[in-house]
């Protein structure tokens, strides 16, 4: 099994051949510089023999039909195995939901990105593949981060694509960070990747990026890289800047980041999440409305249970509208312009 990986250098192929689990782990060297370990299906670690200061997690396929990040991560893994890219920082790649990749669907039974921070074991417990996988992914992130000194720089980029189009093609969600400022340097790293829009979340969630931010104080982001497309139909030239910056990060090459400049980025503050309370929940706007579409104060965004849900601020933009979620889950995030007061500008 692992001999095939060493010959083909195609980790995605190995992952999809064993979508549920791999019975045995393996470890091998690439050249005289990197130790490689496969911990499970879709879980591979590159450990430089001369260790540096960063621990990097790159995750994709938390939703199985979000294919551009899957292709990007597999290209990076292949480059590392072929020694076209040499790891100078520790890096863990996670292909989140292999069964859903094969199925070409967002998930099999349940949205994996609503099952972290222990949500996998709440309620009915570990009753489906996504809940079991969420618990395993938490374990692998813990194994990767916890064995290192806390002063190391921990990073987690959870890569996605969105269901609908967006006025800002690429954007990132910066998880809630009580008592910690947001990193201006990380925002400018994202800008150099071609991701010029950042949303600051306002509350705890059960997402993968918040798990790493909360438990390991990682600079963690949920990163949206455009719209969902079938495997092989992504225009990978749209990710040249992102791939180049990830190559530099992993290879410990100079990042050459600009100083923080608010004029180069679009910053939004999440002001509320609207959860579905009744089965009759419906939006008033059409299904083709793009992410970051703005609505004026008083505008009726949605209706449910005989009540109108209105825009509360002077202007609110919306992201991730989805009326089809189960009762109790989030239907949309509402945004307002953000200030820089809670950003560490590095001055």
Swiss-Prot record:
Pfam families: AstE_AspA_cat, AstE_AspA_hybrid
Residues the entry annotates as binding Zn(2+): 63, 66, 160
Keywords: Arginine metabolism, Hydrolase, Metal-binding, Zinc
Active site feature: 224
InterPro entries listed in its UniProt record: AspA/AstE_fam, AstE_AspA_cat, Aste_AspA_hybrid_dom, SuccinylGlu_desuccinylase
Recorded metabolic or biological pathway in which this protein acts: Amino-acid degradation; L-arginine degradation via AST pathway; L-glutamate and succinate from L-arginine: step 5/5
Cofactor: how and how many bound: Binds 1 zinc ion per subunit.
Record field: catalytic activity: N-succinyl-L-glutamate + H2O = L-glutamate + succinate
Alphabetized Gene3D superfamilies for the sequence: Zn peptidases
Cofactor: Zn(2+)
EC number: 3.5.1.96
UniProt GO MF annotations: hydrolase activity, acting on ester bonds; succinylglutamate desuccinylase activity; zinc ion binding
Role, per record: Transforms N(2)-succinylglutamate into succinate and glutamate.
Family designation: Belongs to the AspA/AstE family. Succinylglutamate desuccinylase subfamily.
NCBIfam families cross-referenced by the UniProt entry: arg_catab_astE, PRK05324.1
Protein name: Succinylglutamate desuccinylase
Species, as recorded: Shewanella sediminis (strain HAW-EB3)
Gene this protein is translated from: astE
């Amino acid at each position: 099994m692992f001999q095939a990986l060493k010959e083909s250098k195609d980790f995605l192929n190995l992952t999809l051949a064993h979508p549920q689990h791999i019975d045995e782990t393996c470890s091998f060297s690439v050249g005289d510089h990197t130790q490689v370990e496969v911990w499970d299906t879709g879980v591979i670690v590159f450990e430089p023999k001369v260790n540096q200061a960063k621990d990097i997690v790159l995750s994709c396929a938390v939703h199985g039909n979000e294919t551009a990040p899957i292709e990007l991560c597999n290209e990076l893994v292949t480059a590392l195995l072929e020694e076209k890219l040499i790891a100078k920082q520790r890096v863990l790649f996670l292909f989140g939901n292999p069964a859903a990749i094969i199925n070409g669907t967002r998930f099999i039974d349940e949205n994996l990105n609503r099952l972290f921070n222990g949500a996998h074991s709440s309620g009915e417990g570990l009753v489906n593949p996504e809940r079991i996988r969420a618990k395993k992914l938490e374990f692998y992130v813990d194994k990767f981060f916890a064995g290192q000194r806390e002063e190391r720089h921990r990073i987690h980029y959870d890569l996605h694509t969105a269901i609908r189009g967006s006025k800002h093609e690429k954007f990132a969600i910066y998880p809630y960070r009580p008592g910690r400022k947001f990193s201006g340097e990380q925002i400018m790293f994202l800008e150099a990747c071609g991701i010029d829009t950042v949303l600051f979340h306002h509350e705890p969630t059960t997402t993968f990026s918040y798990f790493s931010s909360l438990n390991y104080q990682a600079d963690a982001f949920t990163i949206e890289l455009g719209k969902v497309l079938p495997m092989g139909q992504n225009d990978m030239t749209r990710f040249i800047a992102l791939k180049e910056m990830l190559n530099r990060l992993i290879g410990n090459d100079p990042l050459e980041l600009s100083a923080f400049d608010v004029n180069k980025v679009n910053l939004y503050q999440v002001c509320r999440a609207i959860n579905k309370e009744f089965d009759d929940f419906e939006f008033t706007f059409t299904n083709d409305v793009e992410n970051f579409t703005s609505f004026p104060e008083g505008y009726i965004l949605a209706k449910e249970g005989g009540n109108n849900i209105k825009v509360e601020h002077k202007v609110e933009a919306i992201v991730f509208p989805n009326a089809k979620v189960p009762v109790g889950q989030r239907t949309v995030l509402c945004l307002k312009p953000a200030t820089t007061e809670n950003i560490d500008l590095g001055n």
